Amino acid sequence: EIDLPGHQLAALAAYPELGCTGGPYEVWKQWGVSEDVICAGNEKAMQFLEDVLLEVMEVFPSEYIHIGGDEVPRDRWKECPKCQAKIKELGIKGDQQHSAEDYLQSYVMTRMERFVESHGRHVIGWDEILDGELAPNATVMSWRGSSGGYKAAKMHHNVIMTPNDVLYFDYYQSLDTDSEPISIGGYNPVKKVYLYEPIPDGLTEEEQQYILGPQANIWTEYTSTFNLVLYRMIPRIGALAEMQWCLPEQKDYENWVLREYRMTKLYDLYDWNYAKHIFDLEVKITPVVEEGFINVNISKLVDGDIVYVIDDKAPLRYTEPLHINSDCTLSCYISRSDGTRGKLIKSEFRFSKASMKPITLKNQPNKQYAYDGAQVLIDGLHGHTNYRSGRWLGWYGTDLDATIDLNEPTEISQVKFNLNVNMKDWIFNAKSVKVLVSDDGIDFKEIASKDYDMVPADYIPDLYPVELEFEPVTTRYVEVVVTPYDCPKGHTGYGYPAWIFVDEIEVY
């Protein structure tokens, strides 16, 4: 992949005349998206891209050349005289769906596609190349979910399905991220990969033929060794293979896990590092708000007994779902027939008046950090410093606005929760927090609020406790609104919203 016209900061640092501002530019020392991109109105810059592609085609005999097209901010183009002159020269005009700069991106991609096609090759581009006009013969790699692939297939363009929320193998494969090698985020477990269907619903039989197949990706910002590549890849690559080979009606996940378990003897023989999560216990924790308890369902797919321990009591053999309604620590593991034990899985429950109560969200968390949804905020489980653990919900560009129904008039005098702050990852503390109450769930009255200074830039990633105390009040509904900051000047995210991450809302 030769990614263009964005992700070109290294090239601009070497050839500053190819950018809109002329620099100076510095090569980034971290991953991310830079506003500085190749100047689309500079003919010398276009010639540079063609020269690079020509050399790539001379070195690599592949039928396809991936030319990227993803994550191209339009900021510089909007301010650049050369880019605006090119827009005028081409007669480009924006419309309700796309800006003139979006169509300028289409001009760049179409020009490069024609150049590559003229040399007997074909191009692939990320699904952002759909924003504007799609180059005539481009193959689309659908990474921001499956919708881009659906749209491209409808347009009779070839598609490779590689949705990041299923097939990015640099995402976590376990929610116990405190015990995992650090990753970029997300949660793509093996089962999710296995059950994925690469052909979206709603396509005609003819349109389905344009779905060439799925592909998994492992990006390596957080993957420094090949040993770690193997860990992220195996056994998900086995699930990927069978997902591609099998018709939907032929899939059998439990049977596949048993066959994959037998494959571990081969992995061990070759000393391959692989993930073992699917061979340990799966613990599903679900608040049953109607009954006022947490339902804990523990399951396994390989032979062995499930053993659990509550606090310091004697170990017990698990036979049916557990109901938890008071503070405790639950530990469980699989005891295998060969005498070995699986991983010890521990959950610590701490309850408040909000625990296991109905909760609604005005704004949903970002899908990358939505996990089990609103129930994460009232399930009695608290997060640690790793915001990717599944115990945190993340909001981007919007308030957290949660309303909890206490089911009956209840006296309260305190609301508290933790924020997870990691400035480097654009996760800030709250700008403000307010608490409102209501007797009917319609008319709310504010009873407490607090503004917070932004933590300093050198703030060490940690939990940031928020606590609002107020005069006792009897109410049924409690609304908590958490307002985020925007990234400040001098931060790598300047001009963009900051994230906020919240684990458990406690009411006392």
Regions found by a protein language model. Give the residues of each.
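Solvent-exposed serine/threonine-rich low-complexity stretches and specific carbohydrate-binding patches
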Residues: E446-P456
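Aromatic- and acidic-residue-enriched carbohydrate-binding clefts of CAZyme catalytic domains
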Residues: Q8-Q47, D75-E101
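Short, compositionally stereotyped local motifs that mark structural "simplifiers"
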Residues: K251, V257-D401, N420, N429
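Aromatic, loop-rich ligand-recognition surfaces of beta-strand-rich domains
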Residues: T385-A448, D462-Y508
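Gly/Pro-rich turn-and-neighbor structural signature
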Residues: E50-L54, E58-I65, G69-M141, S146-A153, ...
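Short, solvent-exposed turn/loop segments enriched in Gly/Ser/Thr/Pro and often Arg
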Residues: I2-A10, G68-P73, D127-I129, D165
